[in-house]
UniProtKB/Swiss-Prot annotation:
Oxidoreductase among keywords: no
PANTHER family to which the protein is assigned, alphabetical: MITOCHONDRIAL GROUP I INTRON SPLICING FACTOR CCM1-RELATED (PTHR47934:SF6), PENTATRICOPEPTIDE REPEAT-CONTAINING PROTEIN PET309, MITOCHONDRIAL (PTHR47934)
Main location per the UniProt record: mitochondrion
Superkingdom field: Eukaryota
Record protein name field: Pentatricopeptide repeat-containing protein At1g63130, mitochondrial
Transit peptide region: 1-22
Subcellular location: Mitochondrion
UniProt KW keywords: Mitochondrion, Repeat, Transit peptide
UniProt PPR repeat ranges: 80-114, 115-149, 150-184, 185-219, 220-254, 255-289, 290-324, 325-359, 360-394, 395-429, 430-464, 465-499, 500-534, 535-569, 570-604
Pfam families: PPR (PF01535), PPR_1 (PF12854), PPR_2 (PF13041)
NCBIfam families: PPR
Length: 630
């Protein structure tokens, strides 16, 4: 196999003294013919490399740069290595690192010797490709040839260590650089600080800022920006704020980016008032906020339901000629939709269009959700079709929103059509998609179709969650398929998924309504053993089951237990027992329960009042009962 650089077994003293030896410098890197770019002939504009300035090189397109390289290697004599260095540097700035490596190999094969600068470019490219062992091999080769790496080369290697999860080696490299007489610059320190934050070594990163000063390298705006960003991501906002004061004391103006970072962090950690105060502070200091500043604050205010404050900020930024963007409008539209203020959301959408700001998927999805919430399904569908016509393609969340809207409106067949359309577009439905459809079919009394969707969900490899199972069990029980529900419930109990009290309530109610009161009671009694605490619905459901079976004494006993040990009875509990005693002709117990219910500030519900009214007509009750309930 061909080799790009032959490495001597002795190497250079620098390589052997440093951690660079960890990169297996004793092994030459293989040929890079596997790289994804090759020099090809292009029929583009022809360039004379002798007449191209550095500025023009930076303006070259990739195809033209490769074409120019082809012309250079055909020239005799070859252009100087300086000309090749300029071209390789320009291509590296396009982030075409594989191509630079491939061209470097071709230069060597043609006998064009590399110099310090081209070696440095190649090392940087290998580091950017996360091929540290090859970068170290090139470094060893250049040092064997007598080239001492400069600070730029070592910074490239340092960056490679930081991004290659070798942060300890990066720290050691900086220490060895100092020992060997190299003066780390701000890029060195900034790279290492960023790397330390990436590897959760924040205290070392902050301490390094003070070390910079000791080493005669003043932290710059970039340094502080990296540290502030790292601290804010960790939630160390107080430390970030103290660093802000330190900057001002050091006569370094923080700038809008650093303020934005802290304001956004304060918003994320729900310190909205502190964020607004910092916003005022930066404004008073003459640091002009930008659209990013406003977006953070508007989003946060919307999350807190402070619509008027958010709207005022929008007006303020427009007055100051700071143009809101799609993020600004989308945040406000989504917030207004969630608050039920669809008219305001539509006005913002119209304003957005008037300003020639194209809505994104988030904007469209929010409005579709709003239309669905207000049962304006035709408009929701129109908005859905509009976004597709604008080449803004819906994602799973958008589809789920519209499917839910159709299912809620008992138009489940249209929801199913959307589900099929999803598949045709290559989108895979998630747990929410399938659960929504299952619920929709049950609401439409299409029990068989609901079960078919559940089976398809399982066969498609989409895992049902506890909500899916609860909806399935509830639908089966309500459609008289309790035996099927029991089979599903038994499977659920054997699985690793833990049913919640909502699921247990469904099964207890289903059993009781199907006449399996004893089974319902057994399940009720087993809850404490399972570590599940019955709630007021559980107790009321079980009492209702007892009453339906004529077991009034058991219902009363459970009611007493509930008042002593369980959750406090609610209106539903009292009304259930009142009706049971009235049907049984026990007027005294009914009257006592009504008085107790009224003392708890509950009133009779429609079913109880209806029963009392009918019994009044039949002469089985006097009007005093109706007065007690009123």
């Amino acid at each position: 196999m061909r080799r790009l650089f032959a490495i001597s077994s002795t190497g250079n003293r620098f390589v052997h003294r440093s951690l660079l030896g960890k990169g297996k410098c004793g092994t030459a890197p293989p040929s890079f013919s596997h790289c994804s770019f090759w020099v090809r002939d292009f029929s583009g504009v022809r360039y004379d490399y002798r007449k191209i300035s550095i500025n023009r090189l930076n303006d070259l397109k990739l195809d033209d740069a490769v074409n120019l390289f082809g012309d250079m290697v055909k020239s005799r004599p070859f252009p100087s290595i300086v000309e090749f260095s300029k071209l390789l540097s320009a291509i590296a700035k396009m982030n075409k690192f594989d191509l630079v490596i491939s061209l470097g190999e071709q230069m060597q094969n043609l006998g064009i010797s590399h110099n310090l600068y081209t070696y440095s470019i190649l090392i940087n490219c290998f580091c950017r490709r996360s091929q540290l062992s090859l970068a170290l091999a090139v470094l060893a080769k250049m040092m064997k040839l007598g080239y001492e790496p400069d600070i730029v080369t070592l910074n490239s290697l340092l960056n490679g260590f930081c991004h290659g999860n070798r942060i300890s080696d990066a720290v050691s490299l900086v220490g060895q650089m100092v020992e060997m007489g190299y003066q780390p610059d701000s890029f060195t320190f900034n790279t290492l600080i960023h790397g330390l934050f990436r590897h959760n070594r924040a205290s070392e990163a902050v301490a390094l800022v003070d070390r910079m000063v000791v080493k005669g390298c003043q932290p710059d705006l970039v340094t502080y920006g990296i540290v502030v960003n790292g601290l804010c991501k960790r939630g160390d906002i107080d430390l970030a704020l103290s660093l802000l004061k330190k900057m001002e004391q050091g006569k370094i103006e923080p700038g809008v980016v650093i303020y934005n970072t802290i304001i956004d962090a304060l918003c994320n950690y729900k310190n909205v008032n502190d964020a607004l105060n910092l916003f005022t502070e930066m404004d008073n200091k003459g640091i002009r906020p930008n659209v990013v500043t406003y977006n953070s604050l508007i989003r946060c205010l919307c999350n807190y339901g402070r619509w008027s404050d958010a709207s005022r900020l929008l007006s303020d930024m427009i007055e100051r000629k700071i143009n809101p963007n799609v993020v600004t409008f989308s945040a406000l539209i989504d917030a207004f939709v969630k608050e039920g203020k669809l008219v305001e959301a539509e006005k913002l959408y119209d304003e957005m269009i008037k300003r020639s700001i194209d809505p994104d998927i988030f904007t469209y999805s929010s409005l579709i959700n709003g239309f669905c919430m207000h049962d304006r399904l035709d408009e929701a569908k129109h908005m859905f079709e509009l976004m597709i016509s604008k080449d803004c393609f819906p994602n799973v969340v958008t589809y789920n929103t519209l499917i839910k809207g159709f299912c809620k409106a008992k138009r489940v067949d249209e929801g199913m059509e959307l589900f099929r359309e999803m598949s045709q577009r290559g989108l895979v439905g998630n747990t929410v998609t399938y659960t929504t459809l299952i619920h929709g079919f049950f609401q439409a009394r299409e029990c068989d179709n609901a079960q078919i969707v559940f089976k398809q969900m399982v066969s498609d490899g989409v895992l049902p969650d506890i909500m899916t199972y609860s909806i399935l069990l509830d639908g089966l029980c309500n459609n008289g398929k309790v035996e099927t529900a029991l089979v599903v419930f038994e499977y659920l109990q054997r699985s690793k998924m833990e049913p919640d009290i909502y699921t247990y309530n469904i099964m207890i109610e289903g059993m009781c309504k199907a006449g399996k009161v004893e089974d319902g009671w057994d399940l009720f009694c087993s809850l404490s053993l399972k570590g599940v605490k019955p709630n007021v619905v559980t107790y009321t459901t079980m009492m209702s089951g007892f009453c339906r079976k004529g077991l009034k004494e058991e219902a009363d006993a459970l009611f007493r237990e509930m008042k002593e040990e369980g959750p406090l009875p609610d209106s539903g509990t009292y009304n259930t027992l009142i009706r049971a005693h009235l049907r049984d002709g026990d007027k005294a117990a009914s009257a006592e329960l009504i008085r107790e219910m009224r003392s708890c500030r509950f009133v009779g519900d429609a079913s109880t009042i209806g029963l009392v009214t009918n019994m009044l007509h039949d002469g089985r009750l006097d009007k005093s009962f109706l007065k007690m309930l009123s």
